[in-house]
Amino acid sequence: MLPAPRAAPVPASVSLLTLNGEAPLVRGLSLVSQAPGEALAWAPRTSCPGENTSSGRKVSPCSLDISDKLFCSACDQVFQNHQEQREHYKLDWHRFNLKQRLKNKPLLSASDFERQSSRGDLSSISGSEDSDSASEEDLLTLDEERAESEKPNRPPGFYPHRVLFRNAQGQFLYAYRCVLGPHQIPPEKAELLLQNLQNGGPRHYVVLMAAAGHFAGAIFQGREVVAHKTFHRYTVRAKRGTAQGLQDAQGRASRSAGANLRRYNEAMLYKDVRDLLAGPTWSKALGEAETILLHAPRSGRSLFFGGQGAPLQRSDFRLWDIPLTTRRPTFGELQRVLHKLTTLQVYDEDPREMVRFHSPETHCKPVREERKRDTEKEKTKVPSDANKALGQDEEPLKQGSESQEEDGSEVELELVELTLGTLDLREFEVLPKRRKKRKKKERSQKQQCGAHGPLLQQPQDEPFSQPTQVVATPLDTLVDEAKAPGQPELWDMLLAACRAGEVEVLKLQLATGPVDPGVMSLLSAPLGSGGFTLLHAAAAAGRGLVVRLLLEAGADPTVHDSRARPPYTVAADRSTRNEFRRFMEKNLDAYDYSKARVPGPLTQEMEARQATRKKEQKAARRQREQQQRKQREQEEQEQEERRRFAALSDREKRALAAERRLAAQLGAPSPPVPDSAVVNAGRCWSCGVSLQGLIPFHYLDFSFCSTRCLRDHRSQAGRPSS
């Protein structure tokens, strides 16, 4: 094996926030052109079969060797130190590329991974399925960004989100474009970028991040944190990683308590973030900020855009997407992102030259022709049945062997045998549980259709044909009798109408003229998944009018599903259950209602009594609330009077009491009091509590509610004389 390449020199790091126009580092700056025509050529590398250098590149079998250098062969990244390398190995991007390499699939760059993960094209490493219906404007923006980032013949060392400068000392500076000014600065006006860099870039930053129920935002004035806030709400389904809103948008809305809690938390998170950003501090900061950095997946962008009073606008030139792979939104992550973006990398040499000379070469080990033939024989030993089960054909193997024969350099990796040894594990990835369920459903439909028609065109060794013919129950007989060549479409139409509450569609099939015998056979047939009938589906969806129509048409409420539940027990609400009771009141002898678990008939007199009782309860509740409101007002008024009386001095209290005694002796009305709150002089001299209904304690001319207040007042009165 050839010697490993030496590591690239570590660039110096300088904070953009500490620079000024007089710093030697920024003197004589000029923008370095990175046009593809002016870029350096790629360094010669040892070619290996299967290598591709495009953005969606395939990993070369020769790049599977292990190196102790500061380089990641899966992501094609060079690191400055071991700490940065360890941090890279924890990223979802690195783990995703590892899985792609094990599956022999194309790898993604950091920018492609960010765009596809935010759009929802990729499931996360933990198994989430994040997808959302984006607007047309967002999709067009993503397409433009993808076309810009996937331009052919991109030179080495070129980064679309970074700008390369050169100073008078011959040093090269890499700076992130998002901290050098707004979008509206065109590329031809390079002097504006140079001026922003020499001035240390913008000083007012607002960084916002949101993902998976987490929100974090901070306002920075240079390095100083002016304000920051984080929120966390439980919005992501456990063991699934899918947000509840995305699950509902896909038409699989759940009615569980956890789903309702997640929907409530999504609404509260939306309200909390909107209220925070609409506050005086944050709204002023968003208006004065020179740069706004944002990171949010496609499903989380509604927190910031759209709707009434949106805090951000998509056309804002100050708004930038964070061009980094981020972790969970926290205050520490916000500080790390801003520190990373405002750090300049200073090189003594041209970084494009460094990429050329320090790019890791592919190390391949030559092998003998005999060993190559043995390996090809092992590949051809895989049986055809196994290849079919794994979704593979023999043609890729033949093409691979022909390409290796045509290649003049006979090279191969030692890990080829390990790759062949793990092919049997891919069977579980190709055939997941969901696909098995679909196959069972398709087989049952094919078998039912085949009972009344010609035999299906299947091979004789079909593994599932024999067991399905052996199992025969009365339920299967009912299904077979109900099924006809056109019945599956009719069943799907009726089921969709029951779930959606389309009463008019059902009336066309049930209420006009004689009912079709095919439709009658489907009314009580448990044909759905889980043994649901049409009555089950309508009751579970809370469609009371549909339930009434089906019962009047002849649907049997005593038919149970696979979990022994009649339609009444799966009803969504009370109004739907009342439809069964109203039907029972009109048709007492039609069915065995104890088997249907209907508790009893519901007459009009019972409904009238219930309505009257509800009105009385509502009136009593309204009266009780009014009394409680008056009592609270009286208590608040008493507390205010007590506080004001206790705040008076002893001289003012004596004067007020003397005026009231004099007015009482003369029989004249009480003199007006300046403060309308102090209207009762019969209060405790110490704490101000009303003495009405109490036996007061006296000493001298003072009255108190308790001996404790008397003792406190006496000690305070005797304190100056002591």
UniProtKB/Swiss-Prot annotation:
Keywords: ANK repeat, Coiled coil, Cytoplasm, Endonuclease, Hydrolase, Metal-binding, Nuclease, Phosphoprotein, Repeat, Zinc, Zinc-finger
Coiled coil: 602-655
Gene Ontology molecular function: catalytic activity, acting on a tRNA; RNA endonuclease activity; zinc ion binding
Cross-referenced Gene3D superfamilies: Ankyrin repeat-containing domain
Residues bearing PTM Phosphothreonine: 603
Listed SUPFAM superfamilies: Ankyrin repeat
Top enzyme category: hydrolase
Entry-linked PROSITE patterns: ANK_REP_REGION, ANK_REPEAT, VLRF1, ZINC_FINGER_C2H2_1
Residues found modified as Phosphoserine: 256, 359, 529, 676
Feature: compositional bias, Basic residues: 434-443
GO biological process: cellular response to hydrogen peroxide; ERAD pathway; protein quality control for misfolded or incompletely synthesized proteins; rescue of stalled ribosome
Catalytic residues, chain numbering: 244
ANK repeats: 489-519, 530-559
SMART domains noted in UniProt: ANK (SM00248)
Ranges for region Disordered: 109-139, 357-412, 434-466, 595-650
Bias-annotated ranges (Low complexity): 119-128
Family recorded in the similarity comment: Belongs to the ANKZF1/VMS1 family.
Function recorded in the entry: Endonuclease that cleaves polypeptidyl-tRNAs downstream of the ribosome-associated quality control (RQC) pathway to release incompletely synthesized polypeptides for degradation. The RQC pathway disassembles aberrantly stalled translation complexes to recycle or degrade the constituent parts. ANKZF1 acts downstream disassembly of stalled ribosomes and specifically cleaves off the terminal 3'-CCA nucleotides universal to all tRNAs from polypeptidyl-tRNAs, releasing (1) ubiquitinated polypeptides from 60S ribosomal subunit for degradation and (2) cleaved tRNAs.
Name of the protein: tRNA endonuclease ANKZF1
UniProt source species: Rattus norvegicus (Rat)
Name of the encoding gene: Ankzf1
